Amino acid sequence: RIREVIEGTEITFEQFVEKKIFFAKQNKPADLETIKFFGLTKTSWHKEDERLFPDTIECLKKLHRYYKIGIIANQSLGSKERLETFGILKYIDVVVASAEEGVAKPDKRIFEIALQRAGCKLEEAVMVGDRLDNDIVPANEIGMYTIWIKQGNWKDACPTEELEQSDMTVENLSELCEMILLPLDVSGN
């Protein structure tokens, strides 16, 4: 998408990425801030650009054996259908999407809806998220255990406020899976 945004300009891919990292480290919406900085126009989101991280399916398979898994997402209508297309809906027990609920992260109500649907107590829940502002902060505000996964567009963010500090930080889904399954003393195979 970066190449699409900078097409026809004199801005290089490297310049865009460098500025994006700069904004991410300030915990700002890096894509939007970079686009504004360069005076560019945001392109439409293409659902066909959505991809799973390479270790997603394997991690979900392992975790689903021992845990109820839910997704809280700021997504348009059709979240379950997209998860089905990716072949992962069968590993997801609860899907709470903003377009269907009329409330979006970071509003704490969306987390409460997910907990209620999952039949899960707050002290039994773990929020795994890639964004500090939309995932970690609101989950911390309601007292949920938090794991920041430094993957995707927000991997370069730098927690500076107390509420931005996660209980655990992992680099990818494989590491997350390993850390969560370790206390169970299971091989995960």
Regions found by a protein language model. Give the residues of each.
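N-terminal helical cap/lid subdomain that shapes the substrate entry/recognition surface
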Residues: 1-61, 65, 80-81
